[in-house]
Amino acid sequence: MKFRLTALAVAALLTSTASFAGVVTTSSNVDFLAIDGQKASKSLIKQARSFNITDTNQHQVVVRVSEIIRGGSESNLFESDPIVVTFQGTTEDIQISAPTLRSERDVEKFKQSPVISVTTASGAAVQTKQEYLTQEGFLPSVNLVENLSNYNASGAKAAVASFATTTMPTAMGTTGAGKVAKGKVTVQGENAAEQMLQYWFQQADKETQTRFLNWAKKQ
């Protein structure tokens, strides 16, 4: 009898824990750039557009809205600036979504007043705080975590102080096997592609630079 009661108690606990775990997903036009102060990666994101939460604490994501905008015979890719969205976790699954943008007019309206919706699986709206993330430095996407940390330390509208961390600038690199410490990176070029090549070349160690130069000579 004791064993049966213990088994039932364990089963109830497991059921309670399992029901508490929620999945945060996005609409097809929204991508996660950062989750709770960390850059979104395969270790954080279960699939392309989802991750798990197991508490009702405050959470924060940085998202980007992307749409193919068709106008006449041309199609253009729209990608929004990073948007910080802070919300309270729930025991339900959550979806983060953005309106469908079909025209340049929709895009301009969204740029002026971006609205990211957060709802539970049952359709209840989750209160949020959201605003654009200020982007600083060369290749701001590379400095996303640093920019987000500075934002969270600033006490801004959607900031979460506990997600502010002290980080070295990405351009400084790290030391260790196969790595070299980097100082200030200076780039020049006619276009973004050329500047990016210069940036990453200067970030690489000597062996990688040599391999790249040998490859480039063969092209």
Swiss-Prot record:
Belongs to the UPF0319 family. This is UPF0319 protein MS0844. Keywords: Signal. InterPro entries: UPF0319. PANTHER family: UPF0319 PROTEIN YCCT. Residues 1-21 form the signal peptide. It holds the Pfam family DUF2057.
